[in-house]
């Protein structure tokens, strides 16, 4: 076989191997920069990351930073902060390399099949089954531990197959006395509550909340504390002397405010703020307790939208719902590339054997002619 023929055969054989690199031409889900995304943020949803469609994050670390950049170019992560902090990985163990890449990109929460992760990453577990019809488990959600976060799995499509949601379970969840939240909101609400302290001077209690988060994209999530004391409350004001919003106890979405509870008050306030509680009488004894769950509700629920490549398709069944979602955004394949890849693969399957046979026959004819001469 001649040198040029050998090179051509090698090139033909390599074509199918090299062809998948076309998939690097990624698409953009423009719904992320539409009114749909804005509405979901207003409801309280969070946008996290899950890498690039068809790419295993554990094998290709570059998708971690790339997914963050892709998401930030389209929308902010939450009403509480710009940068995404939640990352979905379909792996039980996150090694040090992946962990370092996640932390370097600002991610702080991983889930929801993860069982082991390096220090600096919090794990959100899948403990609420799914919203898929036939898989949803009301009893599992109902048996959740007090003050825990229940993560319910949701994926609108698997390939071209549309997944049906369980409308009865959705309606049931909406009726429960639970806090509708997200991975990031739940995580930072706890942290803000822990970093809140209270002091008393005569008949005035000062409640101060500090923030551990810094930077332009950092999340600033309110925290909740219960402050116990004996005297009755005259009023609750912010640092500017304005009355704090009064909560009724029926709110299920995180909001700043306060309400009376047995033996004191429950206050939810923004980080880096001060709240003043004026009492009828003086006191020198108070007790402060951070509350893990907003409004002192039973437990918390978030619906986790996995492999979200098209926000419209993933949200279309939940218009008007009170549920709050943690959307794990995945950058999709370019639609044009989607149909080109199978066509290219089929062409190679047909063309390569035919070309090799043709070239071999051409070599045989050439060798035969040389022998005759």
Give short role names for the model-derived ranges:
Residues 208-359:
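C-terminal beta-sandwich/jelly-roll accessory domains of carbohydrate-active enzymes
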Residues 20-55, 213, 294-316, 325-329, ...:
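Boundary/entry segment of secreted carbohydrate-active catalytic domains
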């Amino acid at each position: 076989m001649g040198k040029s023929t050998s090179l051509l055969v090698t090139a033909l054989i390599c074509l199918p191997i090299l062809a998948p690199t076309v998939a690097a031409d990624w698409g953009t889900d423009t719904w992320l920069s539409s009114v749909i995304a804005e509405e979901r943020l207003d409801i309280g949803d969070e946008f996290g990351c899950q890498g690039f469609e068809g790419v295993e994050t554990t094998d290709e670390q570059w998708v971690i930073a790339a997914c963050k950049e892709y998401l930030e170019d389209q929308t902010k992560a939450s009403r509480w902060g710009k940068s995404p902090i939640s990352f979905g990985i379909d792996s039980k163990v996150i090694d040090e390399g992946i962990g370092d890449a996640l932390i370097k990109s600002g991610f702080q929460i991983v889930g929801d099949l993860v069982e082991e992760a390096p220090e600096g990453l919090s794990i959100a577990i899948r403990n609420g089954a799914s919203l898929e019809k036939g898989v949803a488990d009301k009893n599992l959600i109902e048996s959740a531990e007090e003050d825990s976060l229940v993560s319910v799995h949701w994926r609108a499509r698997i390939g071209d197959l549309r997944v049906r949601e369980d409308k009865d379970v959705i309606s049931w969840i909406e009726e429960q006395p639970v806090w509708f939240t997200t991975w990031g909101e739940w995580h930072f609400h706890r942290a803000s509550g822990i970093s809140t302290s209270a002091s008393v001077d005569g008949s005035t209690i000062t409640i101060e909340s500090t923030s551990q988060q810094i930077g332009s994209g950092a999340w600033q999530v309110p925290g909740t504390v219960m402050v116990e004391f004996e005297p009755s409350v005259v009023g609750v004001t912010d640092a500017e002397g304005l009355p704090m919003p009064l909560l009724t106890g029926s709110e299920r979405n995180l909001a700043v405010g306060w309400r009376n509870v047995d033996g004191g008050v429950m206050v939810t306030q923004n980080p880096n703020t001060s709240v003043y509680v004026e009492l009828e009488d003086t006191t020198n004894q108070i007790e402060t307790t951070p509350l893990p769950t907003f409004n002192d509700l039973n437990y918390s629920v978030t619906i986790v939208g996995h492999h979200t490549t098209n926000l419209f398709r993933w949200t279309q069944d939940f218009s008007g719902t009170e549920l709050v979602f943690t959307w794990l955004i995945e950058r999709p394949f370019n639609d044009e590339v989607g149909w080109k890849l199978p066509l290219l693969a089929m062409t190679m399957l047909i063309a390569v054997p035919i070309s090799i046979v043709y070239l071999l026959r051409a070599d045989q004819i050439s060798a035969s002619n040389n022998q005759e001469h």
